[in-house]
Curated annotation (Swiss-Prot):
Lineage: Bacteria, Bacillati, Bacillota, Bacilli, Bacillales
Biological role stated in the UniProt entry: Involved in the production of the bacteriocin subtilosin.
InterPro entries (UniProt xref): Metalloenz_LuxS/M16, Peptidase_M16_C
Gene induction: Transcription is highly induced by oxygen limitation and is under dual and independent control of Spo0A-AbrB and ResDE.
Molecular function via GO: metal ion binding
Annotated organism of origin: Bacillus subtilis (strain 168)
UniProt protein name: Antilisterial bacteriocin subtilosin biosynthesis protein AlbE
Gene this chain is encoded by: albE
Length: 386
């Protein structure tokens, strides 16, 4: 087990989270695994409340997501620092998360609750055309549904799962115990007296390479209504935090922030575009461009986007504005324990601290940004009609 301790006096709380990492290729039945994990996490929450009191478990959370090339399952809690609540025993709670005890089975009620919760999350993802289209593009580009909608889960598969599958959860427990485990602790903690503490945290790498390029997939939900297009650009090798900052600034200048170069470009071309936004997907290393337009214009959009990216230019004033927006965005992220804890993986991916990341923004020049955008490559688009 690896323990990542991030000492900070920034918060009056301590956050503790246990994570389980599994290569995507070995996730044979992700729906069943996620249902069990959701049910087990609800059980763990009750165990923690019974052992340490309501304050220790009231902010308990759990999730299952994509983490670069791995499936990440996390459960954790946030509690008041012992300085302000002497009844909380942090050392004992850390050891509880280090040695999690999973339920040997799930009751019918626990199964139903976990399955319905997962179905609701999937439904929200599928009904959001922007999120869904981006996921479909990723799975087409990388040739694996687990990089896209497969990570959400398959609704028909989930509905077909019988509660008897969880009367004996031995195989789920064995699977979780065999995975790479991390214990992440954030707060004013002097030391971590946990068995198996790794003095050096492992590096986070992401070497995924697109297997399909020039993708153009379409799905029709309705013959009426607008189309949502998601175009993807492969950002190549991200060598360090400096490259990460550059692509974040490009993202901001192109479409994420108010002075959108793409929206200006479409307005000048007299195309009926209702919505334009960009997003850098760090897990898939893709710059995504999402556009909502009339169905009759969807063929005109990709060449216009490529034209705008190839002709991209920025000046010092625009870049400084984007830098300030990015600083504010990161400061807001780092201003909550959950936000900072969620960002720890990104910081480890680029081997930097949050202070170094913020300081590195100032060093980027217009020339750096223009040189970097010239290296990204268009890989295709996905369209959802109606």
């Amino acid at each position: 087990m690896e323990v990542n301790l991030l000492k900070t006096h920034q918060f009056s709380t301590i956050s503790i989270a246990a994570s389980f990492l599994k290569p995507i290729e070995s996730a044979a039945e992700p729906e069943e695994e996620t249902i069990y994990f959701y049910g087990a996490a609800a059980y763990l929450k009750e165990q923690i409340i019974d052992a340490f009191g309501y304050a220790a478990g009231s902010r308990f959370m759990y999730s299952a997501n994509l983490f670069f090339d791995q499936q990440l399952k996390t459960c954790g809690t946030r509690l008041i620092h012992p300085l302000y609540n002497g009844n909380l025993h942090v050392d004992a709670l850390m050891k509880t998360f280090a040695d999690l005890s999973f339920p040997s089975s799930l009751s019918f009620e626990a199964f139903e609750k976990a399955r319905n919760e997962l179905l609701l999350k999937i439904e929200k993802k599928f009904t959001d055309p922007f999120s869904y289209s981006a996921a479909r593009l990723a799975e087409e580009v990388f040739g694996n549904p687990m990089y896209g909608t497969g990570m959400f889960g398959r609704r028909d598969r989930i509905k077909a799962i019988h509660p008897k599958r969880f009367l004996d959860a031995t195989d789920f427990i064995v699977d979780l115990v065999s995975q790479q485990k991390q214990l992440n602790i954030l707060g004013q903690v002097q030391a971590c007296d946990v068995r198996g503490h790794a003095p050096q945290t492992s590096a986070v790498t992401s070497g995924r390479i697109p297997v399909n390029r020039h993708v153009f997939e379409t799905e029709t939900r309705s013959a009426a209504g607008p189309s949502v297009l998601t175009l993807g650009f492969d950002c190549g090798e991200m060598k360090d935090a400096s490259d990460y900052i550059k692509i974040q600034l490009i993202d901001g200048l192109l479409g994420k922030y108010g002075h959108s170069a793409l929206f200006k470009h479409f307005r000048e071309k007299d195309l009926a575009v209702y919505h334009v936004i960009t997003r850098y997907d760090v897990m898939n290393n893709l710059l995504l461009v999402s556009i909502c337009t009339d169905q009759l214009h969807e063929k005109d959009i990709p060449p216009r986007v490529l034209e705008a990216v190839s002709a991209f230019h920025t000046d010092e004033r625009e870049l400084e504005q984007a830098k300030q927006f990015l600083r504010n965005e990161l400061l807001l992220q780092f201003d909550s324990p959950e936000g900072l804890l969620a960002y720890m993986g990104v910081l480890r991916r680029f081997s930097c601290t949050k202070e170094a990341l913020l300081d590195g923004i100032s060093a980027v020049t217009c020339r750096d940004v223009l040189q970097f955008i010239a290296t990204i490559n268009y890989i295709g688009a996905h369209v959802v009609r109606g």
